[in-house]
Amino acid sequence: MTETASSDVNAGIAEIDELQRLLMRGTGPGLRGQHFKQHGCVFATFEVLADLPERLRVGLFAEPKVYTAYIRFSNGAQIDDTKPDIHGMAIKLTGVAGRKILEGEEDAATHDFVLADKPVFFIRNTSDYVRFMAEFARSAPRGEPPLAFIAWLKENRPEDLPVLLGFRQQVQDSPLAARYWSQVPYAYGLGNAHACRYSVVPSKDNLVSSIPSEARGPGYLREAMTDHLTRAARPAVFDFRVQLNDDTSATTIDNPTVEWATPVEAVARITIPPQTFTSAAQLAFGDNLSFTPWHALLEHRPLGEINEVRRRVYLSSSGLRHETNQVVRREPTGNEHWSFNMRLSPEELTAGINDDFKAVLAKLQATPPIFSRGVRRTPTGSWQKARRAASRRPVSLKPTCSCLAVSSRSSCAIPRRAVAPTTAHAMGLPPR
């Protein structure tokens, strides 16, 4: 099991990178080359389970712990959710200690898992990937399938043809009710004894879409998430599972087109709490996040040629996207602030406020309103004086923060009706 790329592999990856950039110029280099339509980027917790067997207590899963996570759900290529496609679930854990393997980001405190709603990938190696991307770059702008690659695959790898033809054929009821797989393998430990694949399995209690199939529009998958997390205010729960394999030969590692027959075991639980996730700021945050399987601890390093392709192509396309959008690419800390759950108690709302101010709030709450039950009450005393003073005071519409400026030329992506979270500025959100 080796991760050292040969000169042929390096040349192939460089060609794939150039083809990917060509595709991005077609869709707009400010967008992701793949999975550019997101349904939502949500806050979640990732809880490593207690009492795991010894062989599973490795790296990230060595001890029980709860991580803050961001999860981005997306379509692979389609704008219209009603059309069949591959769908993505990208998970970013924050607060993960330990040195990471991505060059230049070894000290980052994040760890990524990149998954899709199909258990296997349709490409075996770099040379096949080059052939596919070259044909795809020619056919995609015309809205046509890569017919030349399909013909080549039928002749040379007929067993892989059903994998390719079925790859983008999923129609989801809800992103929260689907199963997802890593497709490609990863190490499980510092040695070469075990490889693994990851999968995410939804709880049976996760709601499916309440939108009947005949009423589904091109954006119904985000609506399904909103129905579940915001309107019904229900959590979405998933098992995070690993599938270990003792066969770490190149035949197994470099063939992601075949499912493994080994057992699948739960090692963590993902909980997405009820939340509102559709603000302009949070959607922009999700668009600006970069996910790569190489944001990882050494114990969980990506294996095989396809992961080597992803390492360089993901990094290159992410760099192009952020440069085009004039956004600095930064990893999140887990302390980004949005109103994930608007149902706050009075105690939570007044946390950190001193007692004097709480007393003022209590006094205001106890004061009878000027208008009550349709009967107009005449203000007296200090209330009357305050009203007269207020009526003489000029009203200023100038915002206290440039982010809230009325001008449509504002470059801040924070909604003007809300207080701008400072961490959103730190993430460098682009113009709307």
Swiss-Prot record:
Coiled-coil parts of chain: none
Entry GO MF terms: heme binding
Keyword annotations from UniProtKB, A to Z: Plasmid
Transmembrane segments: none
Alphabetized CDD domains for the sequence: catalase_like (cd08150)
UniProt xrefs under Gene3D superfamilies: Catalase core domain (2.40.180.10)
Name the record gives this protein: Uncharacterized protein y4iL
